[in-house]
Amino acid sequence: MMMAPVPADAQNFFERLFGGGIKERRERDVRPEPAKPKKRVKRVKISAPSYYAYRPDKLEKVSFSDLIEAPRPASFEPSLDGGLFDEAIGGLEDFDLRAYQDVAAALTAHYGDKRAFIWVSGFSPNGRAAEAVRVLGAAADFGLEPADYAVTVPAPGFSMDQMAARNAELIRFEMALSAKVLRYVRDAWSGRVDPNRLSGYHDFPKKPLDLKKVLDRLAHTRDVRAYLESRHPQNERFAVLRVELEALRASAENDIVVDPKLLLRPGKSSPELPKMLALFARETDEAFRTEHAALLESSKDSELYDEQLVPLVKAAQAFKGLRADGIIGPRTVAAFAGESRAARIAKVEYALERLRWHPSDLGSPHVFINQPAFTATYVEGNRDTLSMRVVVGKKSNQTSFFYDEIEQIDYNPYWGVPQSIIVNEMLPKLYRDPAYLDRAGYEVTDARGRRISSSAINWGQYGGKVPFNVRQRPGSSNALGELKILFPNKHAIYMHDTPSKNLFERDTRAFSHGCVRLADPRGMAAAVLDKPVDYVAAKIGAGHSSEKITRKIPVYVAYFTAWPDQDGKVDYHADVYDRDSRVQKALDAIAAVRQPAG
């Protein structure tokens, strides 16, 4: 039976009575014709910075032609060496001395101006030369390679009948020693390795060094050793690492060696367990040993990891700052058994090299983020006044290695989503669901700052750089949490809070996109501001705002697999990004240039 159509006046009556609800429901129930799909461009991911094959500086032959051909100065004033330098200068003819370009330039500039010996008095090397040679020979004390600075010193005896040969020997020794001293100063000042040639993650300003002025200073200084050693970093951490290096070289290999791949769970047995129990007793403190003395003694020969030992293992893990899960695995073994002596020596030498890339004085106060340790420390007066766990970048999104200066704190911040995350992670979702950003609490703006609905954009036409800015509004789900601490840099890295607090319980904390998540962001903000934590809490409670930092606070986003604490104890860490091997390859490449085989 067919129903009669509803008269128009009756339909209008129902619409007036029910507010158009019938019509709206009918319209909602009607599915629009699907839009013709638009062609989607191919997505091109934004790649992370890369590591490079290290290319060391080459050595060039020093040209002494200008020195040799320069006319002798006509002067009635006696020279410091009685004119011996000019008498000997011809000995540089055909002298094959190799040096870096800046060293070669400093040599010819200094001796072109001064035309006098620094390292020779009369017809023999002087005391200043002897002191310089001793310093160069002790380069290993600073983690350098003595062979890089070796110089043949002329014998004290010579024949007066062979003065031309003696003069040639002395002038060549003069130039060779000056070249090696300048190489030493160059290495001590800024390191052998240029960090920016290692990878796109390394970002250090060039440390200015006037090598001609170094020679000018050495020509007059009374304490060659003090001057040369002052070219190394002059901070307490460098000094502690030097002491550690000396102690390691004098030490024996580890007397208790444990399988580094051990994985022992409760209820299982292993011949490695007695070794670990011995290490728990030795590598903790008196309070720990007293509390667990009975169990350590009764179980010292047991290979069975039974339930009564679980609290002991957890306590030992907590003592070392590890996650107390009761599983004796590689990180627990590394924390107690340590690495081989050779591995620790290498890590200390890498640390000494990396410190040379930094300012000699790290400043007070400063913030030191050590990525392999997963820690951030506020340091004032060489004391670690605040230290906390951090989360750093995943291996695919590594945190860069650089330093900067803290400028601002944002409370209840917006999160400006980096282009790499928009393209690599958000675009695939937006292809399927253009309204995704609207629903997830993000704002989209164009280049002129105008707000645009995410659903109104044809995301399919963008495969690489997206011409829109995306930011997440403040709130409990905001990726930056309550605050962020800014030190503007080209890597878009900063310190911030996070809603993902559970990650701080992990031992290995490389989970972010590169920024540094703080376990105690309020504490760090209070330290940076030199204010109480309550002040920071009040600022957070007041809503979104920013506050400038009015004092100089350097921040070091650093990478050290060996680093000393304030009490002089050096801790060793896993090479989470495999950067130690990159430094070693660079050092090998440099050695091949400086000391070619054959």
Residue ranges and their predicted role:
Residues M1-M2:
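Bacterial N-terminal signal peptides
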Residues V6, Q11-A99, L107, A179-R183, ...:
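Well-ordered beta-sheet/strand-loop patches within structured domains
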Residues A88, H110-A116, D141-A165, E253-L263:
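Acidic/histidine-rich, surface-exposed loop or edge segments in extracytoplasmic proteins
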Residues Y100-F142:
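Long, acidic, intrinsically disordered low-complexity segments
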Residues P125-N126, A130-F158, R172, E505-A519, ...:
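Mid-length scaffold segments of soluble, non-membrane domains
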Residues M163-L177, K268-S269:
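Structural motif
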Residues V185-N196:
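Long, hydrophobic, amphipathic alpha-helical segments used as structural scaffolds
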